[in-house]
Design a protein with these regions (language model features):
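Non-catalytic structural scaffold of enzyme domains
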Residues: 1-228
């Protein structure tokens, strides 16, 4: 049984469940992956929690982990990149957690074995260097939007998706993908699970650079685990 610790945000979690279903090679109900979704949007904001010391999300994260353990889950995925800033504390609960950055790195190899990769993520994910440290250890060079671009483009687009205004997110996110491409990125990692929803609200496949979707990467990792 796969556990999904979600609600961060709810639309991204629902999209993950859809992708988990569509990416799994199945021909009947019984071929799909048994899963329990714990969707708790009450968990305090992860970016504020990490950057400002506001309400701590860790108690809510651990409550979800323990609920999934009690449901009998043998592994857990968390379709929220920033929540992985508390990965060690959650992993200490004992049930294996499939790390979203490791999953994304595996997909990235297929489109850009080495070189410069752009990272689009929340300000907290970038500040914690969740992607930069792991990917640079594996040989990539990472670039990201500037602080001003985060304030003017990326953060408002993420907020738009969280507020169910998905169509509003495409233009600023597409502009950032193009900017990272023009700065030398051979691929762009969508390292926030709201960002793929915004990018896919428009003609994302015309941007002239491969994008690596952390939701799809995590879904594929979960499928590999389940099919074992």
């Amino acid at each position: 049984m796969l556990g999904v610790l979600g609600g961060m945000g709810p639309l991204a979690s629902a999209h993950f469940m859809t992708r988990l279903t569509l990416l799994n090679p199945a021909s009947r109900d019984q071929d799909h992956i048994p899963a329990v979704l714990w969707s708790d949007p009450r968990i305090p904001d992860r970016t504020l929690g990490r950057r400002t010391g506001a309400d701590d999300p860790l108690p809510g994260l651990l409550r979800g982990i323990r609920g999934l353990q009690q449901a009998g889950c043998g592994a857990i995925v968390i379709p929220c990149n920033t929540a992985h800033g508390w990965f060690d504390e959650m992993q200490a609960e004992g049930t294996p957690i499939l790390h979203i950055v490791d999953a994304t790195a595996k997909d990235l190899v297929d489109v850009l074995p080495n070189g410069t990769v752009g990272i689009m993520a929340t300000a907290a994910t970038l500040a914690m260097r969740l992607y930069q440290d792991r990917l640079e250890q594996l040989g990539w060079h990472c670039i990201a939007p500037t602080d001003e671009q985060m304030r003017s483009h990326v953060s408002p687009a993420i907020a738009a998706v969280k507020g169910n205004r998905v169509a509003e997110a495409y233009a600023p996110l597409a502009e950032m993908v193009l900017d990272l491409r023009d700065r030398g990125a051979g691929a762009v990692v969508l390292g926030c699970t709201e960002i793929p929803l915004g990018i896919q609200a428009g003609p994302w496949d015309t941007l002239g650079v491969p994008v690596v979707d952390s939701i799809d990467a995590l879904a594929r990792a979960a499928i590999r685990w389940a099919r074992g």
